[in-house]
């Protein structure tokens, strides 16, 4: 069984929205506001089932539930809500591959950001606060192109 953190149950905040909706920007602001020493940050993108190359071959995007380990997300998010540490997978956006898993302990606040954080009732029940970001599509698309080309090794093609 996962080790439980001492103290009261952490407050779990969810920041969900489409790709490039501003989830990471909002999350970084929350971490600065609440204090890094009080916040655990979890990216739901780490629960992708396939790396970037495999997704291209399968012609599937991370927005498809089958492209993600939803069952493991449910289990891990539930453990975090209970104040228990998890061994979390790591997806590396810079090159679209997976890194070694990391041990994560929940702090006073745990902020979880990603595409499918509210996909199931079980996931939704893990959050104390749920935020869904939906910027205008033309703005979001521009942000996505800029981000993917500058930080994720994509081309404008």
What do these predicted ranges mean?
Residues 37-43, 49-96, 109:
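Conserved nucleotide-sensing/catalytic segment adjacent to the nucleotide-binding pocket
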Residues 3-10:
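Phosphate-binding P-loop
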Residues 151-157:
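Small-molecule kinase domains that catalyze NTP-dependent phosphoryl transfer to phosphate-bearing small molecules
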Residues 99-150:
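ATP-dependent NMP and nucleoside kinases share a basic, alpha-helical "lid"
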Residues 23:
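Conserved lysine of the Walker
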Residues 18:
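P-loop (Walker A) phosphate-binding loop of NTP-binding proteins
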Residues 26, 30:
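Hydrophobic positions on the alpha1 helix immediately C-terminal to the Walker A/P-loop
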